[in-house]
Amino acid sequence: MRYFNCLLYWFLSIFIVVVYYNEILTTPIIEPSVEYVLCSTLLDYLKAPIPVLLIDFEILEQIERNSCHMQTEKRVKIGVDKTQENAHLLQKDSRFHVVNYKNSTKTDHLDFEVTTFTKKSIPKRFGARIVGNVQVPLDIQQFMGFWQRSMVLDCKKERNEISQPSTASNDLAALQNVLIENGMFPFLNGRTLLNWYKECTTKHEIFNFMVMASNFNLNFLENLEKGQSKLKLVQKNRTVGNGLRITVALNEVKAHIGLLYKELNEDGSVVHWTKGNNFKNHTIRFSTYDPWCSTDIHGHLFWISCTPGTRIAEEFANTKFTDFV
């Protein structure tokens, strides 16, 4: 009898557990209600008394998907030109998380004061539409790419030691703008990065850019080869899949543009590689290439490695140039 009671108790316990978990698994999950609205309605809600720049990634992604929802409890991140009259009043507006920026006529970039110790800079050259004083970037993915590369990194010299501006930085910026217009995010490398690192300037020589292979625009290369680009193709070496390096010219200025490739080691670690400058066939390998930062060279914004000393040491290993790192 005792055995029968134990067996009955065991079966009842199993039955209760099965019923309980079946109830959990079959009960629909009730998600928090989301008030979906037209994106124009959301932007109308965000309209400000003075011009502002929408820099909130979540809202920008909603606009790009054309699937917006109202979150009145969340502060939306906006950029505000701090020189505007009454700009300080937006700090008290519960709708906004305000990030002040400086828009100097002497530079080609906007400078954001994220915190006391954190500065970010993005190019001024981006298309936007205005909705109720809210400036909304047209190419949202490009704008987000600008912001992801916006952490400011200064060179090693003190400001009072930096040489006077030269036309070289203007020429370099013009070349960079053409690449950006073609959907790429070029960054300085080679001796151009080295010159910035040790002198905070650029020099009249053949400049050096790199572009991630995954970010390279094949249509740009095709237009170059057809002579349908603002740039002139001077030389091409290798293929896109195997260390492509090209030399391009804008007026009298030339630049090498190399591709940076990503690979996985057998242990799963990431390495990057490119082919050497001057069309040499040797391969230059880098440890995991870090996120990119921005820097100012005589009023122009350029993207660079966030650890330039490490990158220079890897690229110029066993040469005299590592003395500067």
UniProtKB/Swiss-Prot annotation:
Q: Which UniProt keywords apply?
A: Membrane, Transmembrane, Transmembrane helix
Gene Ontology cellular-component terms listed:
membrane
InterPro entries per UniProt:
FKTN-rel (IPR009644)
The way it spans or sits in the membrane comes to: Single-pass membrane protein
BP terms from Gene Ontology = protein glycosylation
Transmembrane portions of the chain: 10-30
Give the source's domain of life in one word: Eukaryota
Q: Does the keyword Transport apply?
A: no
- Protein name, per record: Uncharacterized protein W02B3.7
List the source organism. Caenorhabditis elegans
